[in-house]
Design a protein with these regions (language model features):
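Internal helix-loop-helix
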Residues: 78-174
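Beta-sandwich/jelly-roll carbohydrate-recognition scaffolds of carbohydrate-active enzymes
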Residues: 162-164, 187-200
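A short, Trp-centered hydrophobic/proline-enriched beta-strand micro-motif
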Residues: 171-184
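A short core secondary-structure module
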Residues: 214, 218-225
Length: 225
């Protein structure tokens, strides 16, 4: 069993509740994002505090260094419209066609199409299109939350399904916190003055493995919902 060391919190529950409320409000009111133009428009006016080279960015959508990455994500929507067999899937939760990046794979064929979609997007963009982390996360969490509930009688899986369903109905981009905080990049993880800038095993007991450390969101979260 993997456990979190009580002295370090890897998830901020207050922030999670606020985000959950926003998602619920957005998905009840707005129609799903389907096109590249709709996606780009959805990123405006979010009042994010984004700093680039020490300067506050007023509107990330219009920044010349950020916009190319937004255009790459937008291509994931454009591909879904041009080639729905490759870029979309039918959700078992909504019964509707959704962007494949929001789909929980249910078969080997799903995984094959997922890989072909990623390969095609790589050919089209020549860069990172920033949705793989979110897609991989929901597929991993689908299994992990089910196993946790089966072992401990908790309700994580149902809440996870509710979250994914909201994201699918809204057509949102899901980001991920996957990057270690790094600290002094000239030093290896075990050489850091603060070991918690990298996620690491802090102790092992008969009950399981305990972990400590920080994860930071990827840069692509600027372009996520």
């Amino acid at each position: 069993m993997l456990q979190q060391d009580s002295s370090v919190c890897l998830f901020w529950h207050g922030t999670h509740r606020s985000a959950q409320t926003i998602f619920r409000s957005e998905t009840e009111v707005n129609s799903p994002i389907r096109s590249a133009d709709e996606y780009i428009a959805s990123l405006r006016g979010r009042k994010l505090r984004v700093f680039l080279f020490g300067e506050l960015v007023d509107e990330p959508v219009d920044h010349p260094l950020i916009r190319p990455s937004i255009n790459a994500v937008a291509e994931t929507y454009a591909l879904a419209l041009r080639n729905p067999e490759l870029g979309t899937a039918v959700s078992p939760y909504t019964g509707e066609r959704i962007n494949r990046f929001l789909h929980v794979a249910g078969s080997a064929q799903d995984l094959v199409l997922q890989n072909k979609m990623q390969r095609r997007l790589g050919q089209l963009t020549g860069t990172c299109f920033q949705r793989c982390v979110g897609m991989d996360a929901i597929n991993a969490l689908h299994s992990v939350t089910f196993d946790i509930d089966a072992a401990h009688g908790t309700g994580y899986h149902r809440r996870f399904i509710d979250f994914v369903t909201q994201m699918q109905r809204a057509g949102f981009v899901i980001g991920g916190a996957m990057t270690d905080a790094k600290g002094d990049r000239s030093k290896a993880p075990h050489e850091q003055a603060d070991p918690d800038v990298f996620v690491h095993v802090s102790r092992r007991t008969d009950e399981g493995v305990y972990i400590r450390g920080a994860k930071a969101h990827q840069t692509g979260c600027i372009n996520s919902h």
